[in-house]
Amino acid sequence: MKISNDVLDVLSNATTSGNALSLSGQLERGLYQRANKVIEAASGKWNRKAQCHLFDGDAADAVDQIILTGEVTVKQDFGYFPTPEVIVDQLIDLAELIPGMHVLEPSAGQGAITVKALRVGARVDCVELLPENVRALTGAIASAGFNATVEMIDFLTIPPVQCYDRVIMNPPFARQADIHHVNHAMKFLKPDGILVSVMSAGVMFRTNRLTIDFKNKVDANDGEIIPLPEGSFRESGTMVNTVIVKMVTR
């Protein structure tokens, strides 16, 4: 997200101490709201008791990065929308998980799918790109009393190794990124491995070559496309229609 010059000025004039950031002076309401949006996107949260914004880490480091680049990453820029619990349960059921299976979650977010798979008794390797999500993910795993491998990297840059029994995922959708992520994820499965993924409903009706080839792949891998109810991700901040795709490697 690009940041306007007046908000950059506000951040430049702010004072920091440890994980605390205090804005200087009395800001016009609209300007404050825009500055607050940027601070929250950088993981700063208003603390009423402290009367300042508090960050998970060093506030100066977070603000300096924003000022230097003139932008801040928000989760939705990377297509991150948390998976609602009812859909997590459906994914786990479709994956036919049993204890001891080795599972890959390529867009692990903040751990909704990972923790559920760990509770089944699976061994889970997680990939996540956003630092804020990685912090939340590792915290969720630890709080649930489990261990899992977490790697902060762009999943599409990882060379595939066929070592997983299952892949369970909710990838980004923008510009048909979900197809690219699922195609790459299939390369990580052992023979007879199962992939289940939330995807955009566009895979059911779009007619471009990428979509046609993907539907052929679903058919070739004993797959199915299961429509989800409209508004399934409303609580996560999007009304995009979604499906679950299941495939079995042969």
Regions found by a protein language model. Name each.
Residues 1-250:
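Class I S-adenosyl-L-methionine-dependent methyltransferase catalytic core
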